């Protein structure tokens, strides 16, 4: 008789361990490298992700106001400086980069005031 009880008990224990292990693996992914870019606040509060593990490839889960999006990360620290729209950087109205890694040293790929992006010294 004890052997009959051990079967269902063992099955329940095994099922519990499998579910617990699955939760640990899928619930928290390792944070991906890079830093989230500055994103405009989304008024729709769209929740595309909760953690980096929910984003494909090297995309990071980044917040924009009350929303979250999978976004291509910046790979350098610091934030882009505020752009003075009254004095756009003349001569730089073309894209010089797409991501931080294309900029030399500590420079970051940031908006330059005329609708394009260029390598600039970040604020720390």
Curated annotation (Swiss-Prot):
An example Gene Ontology cellular component term from the record? extracellular space
Sequence ranges assigned to domain WAP in this UniProt record: 31-73, 74-123
**Quick one: signal sequence residues?**
1-30
Q: What is its main location?
A: secreted
Q: Which SUPFAM superfamilies match?
A: Elafin-like
Record's SMART domains?
Answer: WAP
State the Gene Ontology BP annotations.
antibacterial humoral response; innate immune response; proteolysis; spermatogenesis
Would the keyword Glycoprotein be found if you checked this record's keyword annotation?
Answer: yes
Name the UniProt key words of this record, in alphabetical order.
Answer: Aspartic protease inhibitor, Disease variant, Disulfide bond, Glycoprotein, Protease inhibitor, Repeat, Secreted, Serine protease inhibitor, Signal, Thiol protease inhibitor
Please describe, based on the UniProt annotation, the reported consequence of changing residue 91 to S: In BENP; uncertain significance
* GO molecular-function term, one example from the UniProt record: aspartic-type endopeptidase inhibitor activity
Q: Which residues are glycosylated?
A: 44
Q: Which cell locations does it reside in?
A: Secreted
One family name in Pfam for this protein: WAP
Is Zinc one of the keywords? no
User: In this UniProt entry, which cysteines form S-S bonds?
Assistant: 36-62, 45-66, 49-61, 55-70, 80-110, 93-114, 97-109, 103-119
Organ and tissue specificity? Expressed in a number of normal tissues, including male reproductive system, regions of the respiratory tract and nasopharynx. Highly expressed in a number of tumors cells lines, such ovarian, colon, breast, lung and renal cells lines. Initially described as being exclusively transcribed in the epididymis.
Q: How does it assemble?
A: Homotrimer; disulfide-linked.
In the record, what disease is this protein associated with? Bronchiectasis and nasal polyposis: An autosomal recessive destructive airway disease characterized by persistent abnormal dilatation of the bronchi, and severe chronic rhinosinusitis with nasal polyposis. Affected individuals suffer from sub-normal lung function, chronic productive cough, excessive sputum production, and recurrent sinopulmonary infections.
Q: What does this protein do?
A: Broad range protease inhibitor.
Name assigned to this protein: WAP four-disulfide core domain protein 2
- Supply the source organism for this entry: Homo sapiens (Human)
User: Lineage of the native species?
Assistant: Eukaryota, Metazoa, Chordata, Craniata, Vertebrata
